[in-house]
């Protein structure tokens, strides 16, 4: 029996270029390029050990200095890789910061990864699914990517649920970032 390939249809987020970056709009959210002025937003998220538990090698909260360095890397990466990098996500109506989502090459060059994280107060409101769906559509329909993966720590079940809601296929475990990760994937329709 032939396995069906999960696909991601174009949900129609509005994509536009902003001065110094890009932006994607969804029903509730504005995703735009990070700027150095976003340090406090990123610190509120990355400074929380609950958020960082499954992020990076150490899984620990970041200091203000580490966040300032991270913003520099995010901005630099976005300039070198148009259409990719972590995007700042906020509510369209209020401007409240609700997280970050973006596309990045996996370090071994084997795939493009969808990555996202949210401040703890924003968990459970559908923001992760909404922003990730828009970024997936951007990757497939604007950047022309054929395949995008989502990687999670094996014990990060909430993130795995988000990836499954997006229609990504669970491909089991593989080594990435020097550790065992759960791999999910989707292909362009």
Task: Give short role names for the model-derived ranges.
Residues 117, 130, 158:
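Short alpha-helical segment within the catalytic ATP-binding CA
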Residues 150-160:
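Conserved beta-strand-loop-alpha-helix junction that forms the acyl-donor binding cleft
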Residues 166:
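Structured interaction and signal-relay segments at domain junctions
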Residues 1-121, 134-138, 142, 151, ...:
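GNAT-family acyltransferases
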Residues 163:
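Conserved active-site tyrosine of GNAT-family acetyltransferases
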Residues 124-129:
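Glycine-rich acyl-CoA binding loop
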């Amino acid at each position: 029996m032939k396995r069906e390939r999960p696909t991601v249809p174009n949900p129609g987020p509005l994509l536009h270029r902003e001065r110094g970056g890009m932006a994607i709009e969804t029903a509730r959210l504005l995703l735009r390029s990070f700027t150095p002025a976003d340090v406090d937003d990123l610190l509120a998220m990355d400074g929380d050990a609950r958020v960082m538990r499954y992020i990076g090698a150490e899984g620990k909260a970041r200091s203000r200095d580490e966040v300032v360095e991270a913003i520099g890397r995010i901005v630099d990466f976005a300039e070198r890789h148009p259409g990719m990098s972590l995007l700042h996500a906020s509510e369209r109506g209020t401007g409240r910061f609700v997280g970050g989502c973006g596309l990045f090459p996996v370090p071994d060059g084997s795939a493009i990864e969808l990555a996202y994280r949210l401040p703890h107060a924003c968990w459970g409101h559908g923001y992760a699914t909404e922003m990730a769906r828009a970024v997936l559509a951007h990757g497939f329909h604007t950047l022309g990517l054929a395949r995008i993966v989502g990687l999670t720590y094996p014990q990060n079940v909430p993130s795995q649920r988000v990836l499954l809601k997006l229609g990504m296929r669970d491909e089991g475990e593989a080594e990435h970032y020097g550790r065992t990760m759960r791999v999910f994937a989707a292909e362009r329709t």
